[in-house]
């Protein structure tokens, strides 16, 4: 739900119920195919790294689930960043707070949620919430893996994989509310009887601590070493680069980048994002084209957009549908520069290019810090659209590659389940053996030049020319 402008709230039990329903369907399908559900050796999951819910003693939610799409904490973020503390960057790799950080959501809950202050015992992410409910754990048994831990943004030591008492004290968050930190493959319990009855799966199946979605997608995309790029083309479009640790040039104020710990030991990565990247695509299909529930319509739009020239004839889409951030904190979503000649296909290409323009800025920052970007792997749902992959290749001046398993996180979870139960000894080798390239795109220098010219003009337009217009639009939204 969207109770106020910039607020995005969910019921975390929706995730739980969807998982239980899917597990029951899998059980039925296994039996129909003559396979025994008792052969399932482990349950492993991954989830959103920037989103939390407050829970009580019985592991039941006492707050809404708030994630990275929410920008209600922007004023608080500005107060935190005004402190200009080197501690943030030194321990987390993140020099500045962001409105999407769970650390900021926790501060908001503690200040504004009487329910949490009275009954709350822990803050948890959505995947650990589902996993602990499947295992029938109490609220005080809450956990988080060391990768998703780094999704908090602030409050922890990323290299030591522990909560930071000094940071938490500054943030005003009592460490008693923080979940215990585990390895992703640690066992947290077994499938409880109540969930066994609802799913048809045998009770006692080992349940693992789980991982972050981006971390698993990167592994599923074959990113095992430093200096590799990944475009996670999901609801929140993310552009990631793997590293060996904190790079000071990328962990300074103003870069807009986030630093995280990977699933495997001694693996790290930076990422920048377009919060409404994939969400903007769905919004256009569902609400502008009125094809809600019709996933095939994406193909119709891209087929028509192939006939639209690179740059969309100067038509721009600004993808700030849930509000802006950073220097563009007052920005809002809009189409610009349209004429009577423009149709849904021009608009669709402009939507695809909008995410690419934000990616160009991220790529410029990576390259300026000495990270080479000549080959980028694209994963998740957006990777299926080869037009979008080709557009990104031109805009980023790099080869773009996709793999047959576009949802790499699911396969990666299966591999970790096997690793945790002793069925295999080497995660990297197992993943490398099943990853198969399924398409690539190369940049056209002339189109790359065109996009660079458009990018520079767009940057000036948004940051300079439209700043007053965005402020006026904010005031207009408040008129009732």
Predicted regions and their residues:
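N-terminal phosphate-binding loop and adjacent alpha-helix
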Residues: 1-36
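Glycine/Thr-rich phosphate-binding loops that ligate phosphate moieties of nucleotide
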Residues: 13, 41-82, 115, 137, ...
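ATP-dependent carbohydrate kinase catalytic cores
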Residues: 155-265, 276, 292-296, 303, ...
């Amino acid at each position: 739900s969207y109770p106020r402008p910039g607020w995005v709230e969910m019921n975390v039990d929706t995730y739980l119920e969807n998982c239980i329903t899917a597990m029951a369907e899998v059980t039925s399908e296994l039996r129909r195919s003559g396979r025994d559900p008792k052969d399932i050796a482990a349950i492993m999951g991954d989830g959103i790294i920037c989103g939390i819910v407050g829970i009580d003693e019985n592991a039941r939610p006492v707050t809404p689930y708030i994630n990275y799409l929410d920008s209600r904490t922007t004023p608080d973020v500005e107060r935190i960043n005004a402190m200009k503390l080197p501690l943030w960057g030194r321990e987390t790799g993140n020099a500045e707070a962001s409105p999407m950080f769970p650390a900021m959501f926790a501060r908001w809950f503690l200040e504004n949620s009487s329910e949490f202050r009275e009954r709350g015992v822990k803050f948890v992410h959505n995947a650990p919430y589902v996993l602990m409910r499947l295992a029938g754990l109490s609220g005080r048994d809450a956990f988080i893996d060391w990768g998703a831990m780094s999704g908090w943004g602030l409050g922890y030591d990323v290299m030591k994989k522990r909560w930071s008492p000094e940071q938490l004290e500054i943030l005003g968050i009592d460490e008693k509310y923080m979940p215990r930190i585990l390895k992703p493959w640690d066992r947290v319990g077994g499938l409880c009887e109540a969930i066994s009855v609802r799913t048809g799966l045998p009770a006692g199946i080992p349940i693992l601590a789980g991982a972050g979605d981006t971390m698993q997608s990167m592994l599923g995309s074959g990113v095992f070493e430093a200096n590799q790029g990944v475009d996670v083309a999901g609801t929140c479009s993310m552009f990631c680069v793997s590293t060996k640790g904190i790079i000071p040039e990328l962990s300074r104020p103003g870069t807009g980048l986030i630093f995280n710990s990977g699933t495997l030991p001694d693996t790290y990565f930076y990422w920048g994002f377009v919060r409404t990247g994939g969400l903007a695509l769905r919004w256009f299909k569902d609400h502008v084209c009125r094809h809600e529930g019709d996933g095939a319509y994406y193909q119709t739009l891209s087929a028509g957009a192939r006939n639209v020239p690179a740059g969309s004839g100067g038509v721009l889409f600004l993808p700030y549908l849930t509000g802006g951030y950073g220097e563009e904190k007052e920005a809002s979503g809009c189409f610009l520069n349209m004429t009577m000649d423009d149709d849904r296909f021009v608009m669709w290409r402009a939507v695809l290019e909008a995410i690419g323009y934000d990616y160009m800025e991220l790529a410029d920052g990576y390259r300026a810090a000495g990270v080479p970007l000549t080959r980028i792997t694209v994963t998740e749902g957006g990777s299926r659209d080869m037009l979008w992959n080709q557009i990104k290749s031109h805009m980023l001046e790099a080869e773009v590659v996709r793999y047959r398993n576009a949802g790499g996180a699911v396969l990666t979870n299966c591999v970790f389940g096997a690793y945790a139960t002793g069925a295999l000894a080497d995660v990297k080798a197992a993943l490398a053996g099943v990853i198969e390239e399924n398409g690539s795109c190369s940049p056209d220098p002339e189109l790359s030049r065109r996009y660079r010219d458009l990018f520079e003009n767009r940057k000036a337009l948004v940051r300079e020319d439209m700043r007053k217009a965005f402020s006026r639009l904010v005031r207009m939204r408040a008129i009732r």
